[in-house]
Amino acid sequence: MAGYSCKKSNQINPDSNLKLSFSADTVLFDTVFTSLGSATQELKIYNTHSDDLKISSIRLVGGEDSPFRFNLDGESAIEIYDKVIPAEDSLFSFLRVTINPNDLNSPFVVEDELEFITNGNTQTIKLLAWGQNANYIVADKVVNIGGTLYPYHIVADSLQTTVWTSERPYVIYGYALINSYGTLRIEKGTQIYCHQGGGILSWSDGQLIIDGTAEEPVIVQGDRLEAYYNDTPGQWEQILMMDGRAGADHRISHAIIRNGTIGINCQSVLKATECALRIDNTVVENQSGYGLFSILYAVEAKNFVIANCGFANLWAFGGDYRFVHGTIANYWNANEHNNNENAVLVANYALDGNNQPFYYPFRMEMDNCIIYGKQKDEFKGVFGPEADSIYTFDHCLIKSEKYNGTMPGFSHCLFNLEPFFSDPIKPDCHIDSIASPVIGMGNPLFGNEVPYDLDGVSRIGTPDMGAYQYMYGR
């Protein structure tokens, strides 16, 4: 179907400076289908100029495979040629999408573009629909943080507690924002799929609680379901936590966070002494940037794996950190770039916008941990004298040519001994050989503090280093 208003026809003007205008730059079909169905939206195309314009082609970029169709002059099409819009006139196009939410191969976010070529100019309109029966969190506002624009939708407003359950998956388009003094609690078994460029954002004084279990972890990953994307990093942005508040620690328990850019990004600007994050029984893997990125936070992590990141697995400037029974392993093997950073990079100073250092006290304790990877040195500390820097390693395996067990801060540590991970590229950081030097070499005091490994296997008495106990035949 198409409609024109009645204007006097003019000569077609081929001037490349003349372009079309549209009623929208994105057409959103916001219906969430529970069964096979279709929806229709309207797009208005304007010629605001005093001469006629010829549109050389209008086409769906996705072609025959696109679930979208558009309708002009009563004809449903994927491509139309040589359509004229008279001067100061408009054209109506009707767009339709057909969705089968029961098709497990259907993506959560269905996208295409409607392309217009006029006088050599290519203009596109984004088409967007929801492909499965899920809870969709769609950005409707934008906030500027340090010069970066973050599109967001508030999921937990001030003084509000919002609970996400496992009944249906959550798909985040943009950022799901926790407002100041709001709380988002994510229950066991919840599946969260983040679209490109999106994630979860806890605003200053907000609180995020991820409350999974060993049997039903919370999973946060990208929204592409094709097999090719199972291990593709950088599909979504991050879990970002701004300044926290006293008595409202962020907590992440029994979670799997994979295939993003920064798995967990916690940054304090104003209230470093009140910003706390507690992590347990959690895996952060396959991030194109950092696994855990922290500025002036207090982080305690137990029974955790941070594996295979494009930059450092753990990057921390200032703050207070304690890690118990963690495996930090970087065997990055993706195609974007070669990773030349250390698995753990920590500092008590950073450079400001004028390239001048500013300092903040740093303290870190690592107990019964493994730090290993492909680099010669997988731990690097960058410290200046203007602020305190204290770090201790107790019963840890570390890959390093710079540090050794005779140096201050290292107690009962092993260096440069192959840990024998099952498949570090995959990554699978279980220990699969009785020859591994980490077996039985943990401090029992720390083992008693975390009596079961990431798989629920007891480590009481003779704990291994790292997140997993060795089990013969596993």
Descriptions of predicted regions:
Residues S294, V299-H430:
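Predominantly extracellular beta-rich ligand-binding scaffolds that present long acidic/polar faces
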Residues G3-S5:
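C-terminal motif of bacterial Sec signal peptides marking the signal peptidase cleavage site
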Residues T40-N47, L95, V110-T118, I239, ...:
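Buried hydrophobic-core signal for structured, non-transmembrane domains
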Residues Y136-D140, L208-G244, H337:
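Right-handed parallel beta-helix/beta-spiral solenoid domain characteristic of secreted/periplasmic
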Residues K7-L28, T48-R96, P101:
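Surface-exposed binding patches on compact interaction domains or structured appendages
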